[in-house]
Design a protein with these regions (language model features):
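Divalent-cation
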Residues: 1-200
Length: 200
């Protein structure tokens, strides 16, 4: 969220109290208060890593991941297709996929609906170049080449997202761990971002 220069007090959907201040977010973690930067403070880092993406889409992805999904411990993989290409669904398993309602990560008014949908679905969510969410529940398959090239000591959600971005260089993945951190992958590499609690 963007800071208006004032301190805002909020109780999340999950009942967690938090304060938005001009310098960060103060959040109750169940046993102690934690301070973390806002998504806006991460924007220079993310824009530098993904300069061709529209700012409003990157900001929306960061806000949704770090201020909605992460505090609620909702694991998610958001695949942002920077340059759509025809017949580019290799590596995708649509057997459990669902068409998305007309929602966009660039529209803050859509976050509550996206939050609800992502809390009830697993696998990857596809986001087009303009921020439109096109599908939910898409499985990711790795090529043999990406399995060789990307050897990541992490959970399945992170490995599959990293390998997918290695196979699809025009796609970046925002991965939200169920324990909070948000990681951005591009070309098979973790290129930024740890946004939960005290992870740094």
């Amino acid at each position: 969220e963007r800071s208006p220069g004032a301190t805002l007090v909020q109780r999340t959907i999950m009942g967690v109290p938090r304060l938005f201040t001009p310098t960060g977010v103060v959040e109750w973690g169940g046993s102690a208060w934690r301070v973390r930067p806002t998504a806006e403070q991460y924007m220079p880092l993310v824009e530098g890593a993904v300069p061709e993406a529209p700012r409003e889409v990157l900001q929306g992805l960061l806000d949704l991941a770090s201020h909605w999904l992460s505090p609620s411990r909702i694991g998610a993989t958001l695949l942002h297709d920077l340059v759509p290409r025809p017949h580019d669904d290799h590596g995708q398993d649509h057997s459990q996929a669902l068409p998305a309602p007309p929602l966009s990560v660039a529209e803050r008014a859509h976050f509550a609906a996206l939050y609800s949908a992502l809390a009830q679905t697993d696998l990857a969510t596809l986001v087009s170049a303009d921020g439109t969410v096109t599908q939910l529940g898409v499985g990711l398959r790795s090529s043999e080449e990406s399995e060789e090239a990307v050897r990541l000591d992490a959970g399945m959600r992170h490995r599959s997202a990293a390998r997918y971005t290695w196979d699809h260089h025009h796609t970046v993945a925002f991965v939200v761990s169920e324990d909070g951190p948000v990681t951005l992958f591009r070309r098979g590499r973790n290129i930024a971002v740890c946004m939960a609690g005290d992870c740094g």
